């Protein structure tokens, strides 16, 4: 299940970013400021906090292959039950689209790792998405 409507996005996986001298390791989806973000998978919350790059973000491990990062959420939008160690189900609300951290406008930074390796969210979601 996609965490938000993914019809509009502005930066894809693997795009070179000269300003940071690095590749973009996720997909920036733009469903609109304040849109509810849901968990794309069942799993366990690894972290729900603020960082300079991802802003307010949630990281969920699916217990098998993937760790999923949801970044740039509105301050205060992460529900109180979304804390490290909490169990989430696919479709559970985990926050709202915002523009916190290193962000140029409202969007969801959606990043998936297989172990320590970032993978293209399109490939994973096209293979496993049910919604």
Please annotate each region the language model reported:
Residues 22-25, 39-80, 106-112:
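Zn2+-dependent peptidoglycan hydrolase active-site motif and core
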Residues 57-61, 84-131:
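Conserved, short, structured surface segments that act as functional micro-motifs
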Residues 27, 35, 68, 95, ...:
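Glycine-centered loop/turn positions within well-structured domains
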Residues 14, 34, 63-65, 75, ...:
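Solvent-exposed coil/turn segments that connect beta secondary-structure elements
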Residues 4, 8, 69-72, 119-126:
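Short amphipathic beta-strand/extended segments with alternating polar/hydrophobic composition
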Residues 25, 33-36, 78, 84, ...:
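Short, conserved secondary-structure segments in the cores of folded domains
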Residues 12, 48-49, 73, 97-100:
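Residue-level recognition of beta-strand microenvironments
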Residues 1-56, 90:
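Surface-exposed, glycine-biased beta-strand/turn segments
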């Amino acid at each position: 299940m996609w965490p938000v409507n993914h019809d509009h996005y502005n930066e894809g996986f693997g795009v070179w970013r000269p300003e940071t001298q690095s590749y973009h390791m996720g997909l920036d989806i733009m469903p609109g400021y304040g849109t509810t973000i849901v968990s794309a998978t069942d799993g366990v919350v690894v972290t729900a906090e603020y960082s300079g790059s991802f802003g307010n973000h949630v990281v969920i491990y699916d217990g098998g292959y993937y760790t999923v990062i949801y970044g740039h959420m509105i301050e205060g939008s992460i529900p109180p039950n979304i804390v490290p160690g909490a169990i989430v189900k696919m479709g559970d609300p985990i926050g709202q689209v915002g523009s916190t951290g290193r962000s140029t406008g409202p969007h969801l930074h959606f990043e998936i790792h297989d172990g320590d390796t970032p993978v293209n969210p399109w490939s994973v979601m096209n293979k496993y998405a049910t919604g």
